[in-house]
Amino acid sequence: MARQRRSLTGRLFRLLGRALILLVVLWGAMVAAVVIVGHRDTARTADAIVVMGAAQYGGRPSPVLEARLDHALRLYGRGVAKTLILTGGRQHGDITSEAESSARWARRHGVPKSDIIIENESRSTTEQMHAVARIARARKFDSVVLVSDRFHMLRLLLTAWKLNVTAYGSPTRSSPIVLTDAEGIRYVLAESLKAPLAFLLEDAAR
């Protein structure tokens, strides 16, 4: 009897060990996917360029948000799309929304108001993508180009696919968040968990 219990315990530990190894391998694959997708720019002619919201300070875009806007402006100037969708609501304590800050920046840089759509209610990536999907359906847009940081792209594209939005990724190359430094690595590791959650559970990856 004791021998049987030891045998059963041994098999259980082996199964747990294999499961742990499998989880580590899968997590490693997700980390690699975040990095690989983040380095692919698949921008092509579309109906709109979407700028994902980020922090702003008193109406002034943060360096992260400004890098996204700079990149979107270059795409707009190349004729990738004639419309900018600027996303992001007010975070706690803000006097203005991320989208409104982005819109002011875009107008100062020559984008006419008629080419700008402001989405200023969302407060998370999930909410932003749902808002983009609603706008795309209402405007009968066939496709959009998503602009954000490299670490963000896999989750955005998975969410877009789940929401039946045809989307192309175009990560900014000038963000102060660099994937190879400590801050960038933290973002990559976080996204390696958030991306599959966004696909499987959606709201859990906010």
What are these regions (language model features)?
Residues 31, 35-189:
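A structural signal for short, hydrophobic/glycine-enriched beta-strand patches
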Residues 28, 181-206:
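A transmembrane-helix-recognition feature enriched in membrane-embedded lipid enzymes
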Residues 1-47, 206:
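N-terminal membrane-anchoring alpha-helices
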